[in-house]
Amino acid sequence: MLIMILIFLIALLGLGLSQTHLLSVLLCLEMMMVSLYLGLGMVSISGLHYPLMIALVLLTFSACEASSGLALLVLISRSHGSDLLKSFNLS
């Protein structure tokens, strides 16, 4: 269980440090979701059966997040010419 927390914190650190490309931000978010999913899987293996439904919902949301993130990446890279976060006007 400690390793899942460590993976989550590494992904959070990567999210904070890699602010250049949109794809790297999406990969860090996906790594955070996978670590949460694995953590819920470890809890359900240890004897508690109620997180199993939550894990399935989390897996569904992470699949939707990945597909919408990749669609957004394609849209932005076609309209702006690159996926650099510094080239976006977020204000």
UniProtKB/Swiss-Prot annotation:
Bilayer-crossing regions: 2-22, 38-58
One Gene Ontology cellular component annotation held by this UniProt entry: mitochondrial inner membrane
Catalysed reaction, written as an equation: a ubiquinone + NADH + 5 H(+)(in) = a ubiquinol + NAD(+) + 4 H(+)(out)
Function in brief: Core subunit of the mitochondrial membrane respiratory chain NADH dehydrogenase (Complex I) which catalyzes electron transfer from NADH through the respiratory chain, using ubiquinone as an electron acceptor.
Keywords: Electron transport, Membrane, Mitochondrion, Mitochondrion inner membrane, NAD, Respiratory chain, Translocase, Transmembrane, Transmembrane helix, Transport, Ubiquinone
One Gene Ontology molecular-function label: NADH dehydrogenase (ubiquinone) activity
Protein name as catalogued: NADH-ubiquinone oxidoreductase chain 4L
Membrane topology: Multi-pass membrane protein
Enzyme class: translocase
Predominant localisation class: mitochondrion
Keyword Transferase in annotation: no
Similarity comment text for this entry: Belongs to the complex I subunit 4L family.
Subcellular localization, as worded in the UniProt entry: Mitochondrion inner membrane
Extent of the signal sequence: none
Keyword Hydrolase: no
Subunit structure and binding partners: Core subunit of respiratory chain NADH dehydrogenase (Complex I) which is composed of 45 different subunits.
UniProt cross-references to InterPro entries, sorted A to Z: NUOK/Mnh_C1-like
EC number(s) per entry: 7.1.1.2
